[in-house]
Amino acid sequence: MGLLHCFHIHASAEKEALVVAVVWHIEIAPEAGDAFERLYGADGEWTALSRRSRSFLGSSFLKDLAHPERYLLIEYWSEMLVYEKHLADFGAEVQSLEEERARLVVRMEAMGVFSALDVPDRVGPTWSRRSG
C-alpha cells in the first residue's frame, strides 16, 4: 500500500498549515504487537527512515488501552511537499518497510492530513526522539 495516493490536499490548505500531521489508524494481527512496536517505535526502522528528512519533526505512536491491537500513528512534518519528496526519494526503503508492515497489519487506514494547531516541543515520550 503506497502512501502518496492516500491523501489529496487542497493547495490553499497546504499553504496555511505550518505543521502537518499525517494520521493513520492501524489494526495489527494477533501476536504482532512486539514486532509492530519495534518497527514503528521511537527506535524503529520506520522512524529512523523518517528522521533522514529535514522536514520530519517527530511522531506520536499511540496504542489503544481498551483494544491492544489498535494503534494511531501521527507523524508531524513541517512541509507536505517535502514529506511527499521524502517518500519518493526513499521509495525502495519505504517499499521494503511497507512489505514488512504488511506481515504484521490486518488493516491500515489513512485518516487524513491535519493542520497541527498546538504542537508540543520536540521532546518527551510521545515524540520519536530518544536521548542517550
List each model region and its residues.
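The identity of the second residue at the extreme N-terminus of proteins
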Residues: 2, 20-21, 132
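Short, well-ordered beta-strand segments in beta-rich or mixed alpha/beta enzyme
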Residues: 20-27, 57-89
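An amphipathic, aromatic/His-enriched active-site/gating alpha helix that lines ligand/cofactor pockets
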Residues: 2-4, 41-58, 76-113
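Short, surface-exposed ligand-recognition loops at beta-strand->loop->(often short) alpha-helix junctions
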Residues: 27-40
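Short, Lys/Arg-enriched N-terminal segments with co-localized hydrophobic residues
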Residues: 6-18
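Residues embedded in well-ordered secondary-structure elements
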Residues: 13-15, 48, 62-63
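Acidic/histidine-enriched, glycine/proline-rich intrinsically disordered or flexible terminal extensions
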Residues: 113-132
